[in-house]
Amino acid sequence: MGRFIFVSFGLLVVFLSLSGSEAGFCCPSHWSSYDRYCYKVFKQEMTWADAEKFCTQQHTGSHLVSFHSTEEVDFVVKMTHQSLKSTFFWIGANNIWNKCNWQWSDGTKPEYKEWHEEFECLISRTFDNQWLSAPCSDTYSFVCKFEA
């Protein structure tokens, strides 16, 4: 009997640890989830700095969206294409603090650089994810992201 309880307890521990790994995260209401992250499209237009500040106020660890895989890009492009009437939206890549060093507003580095560096902030097209630099003082819709 003791062995049965021990084995049953062991299986319960394994089940609980596995169920909490990837499937255990959830996003707040009106946020979409993808690969342990939560995303939300905001239709109101703001400058890059105001949009980043707004994102940080939405949830702990939230910033303008950063991209780290083509699958993530596809997920966000689909979201923005469906919900935004505008063609462009802010993304978190910028070189505001260091002209020679592009980074995402969450502090991570872009894995690739496929844009012309005319301005310090980046926008993405809603239908094909082409990145373009834009004056940070322009106003666009935006997407916020945080790790669940």
From Swiss-Prot:
Protein name: Snaclec convulxin subunit beta
Record-stated family: Belongs to the snaclec family.
PROSITE patterns named in the record: C_TYPE_LECTIN_1 (PS00615), C_TYPE_LECTIN_2 (PS50041)
Source organism superkingdom: Eukaryota
Self-association and partners: Tetramer of heterodimers of alpha and beta subunits (alphabeta)(4); disulfide-linked.
Miscellaneous: Negative results: does not act by binding to GPIb.
Signal peptide region: 1-23
SUPFAM superfamilies attached to this UniProt entry: C-type lectin-like (SSF56436)
Function field: Snake venom lectin that activates platelets by binding to the platelet collagen receptor glycoprotein VI (GP6). The indirect activation of integrin alpha-IIb/beta-3 (ITGA2B/ITGB3) also induced by the toxin is upstream the cytoskeletal translocation of GPIb, FcRgamma (FCER1G) and 14-3-3zeta (YWHAZ).
Subcellular location: Secreted
Disulfide bonds: C27-C38, C55-C144, C121-C136
Organism from which the protein derives: Crotalus durissus terrificus (South American rattlesnake)
